Amino acid sequence: MRAHRTLTHPTIIVSAILAVALAAPAGALASKRLIIDGSTSMLPLVQKLSTAYHKAFPKIPAPKVGGGQTDIGINDVASGRVDIGDASRDPIPGVDPHGLVFSKIARDGICVITNEANPLSNLTQETVQGIFTGNIRSWSQVPGSSLTGPIDLFDREAVSGTQDAFQDIFLGETLKISPSATQESSEGLEVNAVGADKSAIGFTSFAATLNGGVHTVDYQGIPCTLTNAKSGQYGGVRNFWMVTKGEPKGEAAKFIDWITKPGNLTVRKIVSSEWIAIH
């Protein structure tokens, strides 16, 4: 008599899973959806790159991209909440969590902005430092200003990579932005605030000025334009980074490698439209 083997419920479940795995297309089960958050300055760029990546590799889920500001992205990737954190300022040894790897994907210009009612032609580094540290408080003290009243100073929040980059590039290691400045949580809010206040001054990513509404001020005699930033003439340029916990691996490595691969014309076209390509 032939023996019969009765399958238990766990055996049936495992067999079913194996059957599905064997029937699935190669790589279909291996691909996970990347979760990315962090810098609001980088958000438009990373969203465009995510869309292009999914178009190039339609079997790979498009990364889920969110904002939240640089320090939030860095802390989220360190804690494992996300796969990649976007950072719009350079690594800070002793401040950033241990074990993170920063991969540069692009560069970006930071512009000083005023209200269109106060179209300053130029600001020197000394004047920028005086204004943003609070030592210069009246427009009457600023050469070329059409105003004479108090300066309304706008800043970004402390978790902002743009704030860190602005301080490093424009103010230097020792100076800090005045605590009396009004802090905004995103570039869009910063631009809107300066655009609504004729006495205002602030700073933002070059890409955030493209829709108008504010006046971009020349810095050290050089206009804040994409062309000048690419050529190296304009000094207010910072790096864009994708941050991982340890060396990039899995889907995060594939995405970052695709972005940073020399000769990737798709990426170069996207980056060069509003930012500065690194290849």
Language-model segment annotations:
Residues R2-V14:
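Bacterial N-terminal signal peptides that target proteins for export
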Residues I12-A23:
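Bacterial N-terminal signal peptides
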Residues A28-H279:
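Exported/periplasmic ABC-transporter solute-binding proteins
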